[in-house]
Amino acid sequence: MNITELMELFSNPETIKTLETGDLMTGIGVTVVLGMGITVVALIFLMYIIGGMAAIMAEKPKEVKETAAAAPKPEAAAAPAPAANNDEELVAVIAAAVAAQLGTSASNLIIRNVTRSLDTTPAWGRAGIVDQMATRL
């Protein structure tokens, strides 16, 4: 029995029961190889499509045209603004957050000291750890 006849018999559930063990195993093997083969071919096809899309969408390096007269190089950039400016902004943001949490105006608060916490775990992370430890016993 050739493979096409075997696969025709294999397509009908009633005729599968009448097949001999060798023919049944051959049909199973052909079905597995066809299924896996089609899957591998489809995945390879998708791989090439995605690779092509990545190549099309990738940014191409911009070509810089050299001018005859070289532009003078700029001097060193000015130093960034002092950190005190950023600290004032940070205090203002913290004051606004505390005021929003307390439901009051930021002008009603006096912030005397702002220090960084040693534990950098977010509050939800600490709450999860406490919850796990509480339910452990």
Swiss-Prot record:
Signal peptide coordinates: none
Reaction equations catalysed: (S)-methylmalonyl-CoA + Na(+)(in) + H(+)(out) = propanoyl-CoA + Na(+)(out) + CO2
Localization annotation: Cell membrane
Keyword RNA-binding: no
Main location: membrane
Record InterPro entries: Na_pump_deCOase
Entry similarity comment: Belongs to the OadG family.
Subunit structure: The methylmalonyl-CoA decarboxylase is composed of four subunits: the carboxyltransferase alpha subunit (MmdA), the tunnel beta subunit (MmdB), the biotin-containing gamma subunit (MmdC) and the delta subunit (MmdD).
Protein name: Methylmalonyl-CoA decarboxylase subunit delta
Organism whose genome encodes this protein: Propionigenium modestum
Gene: mmdD
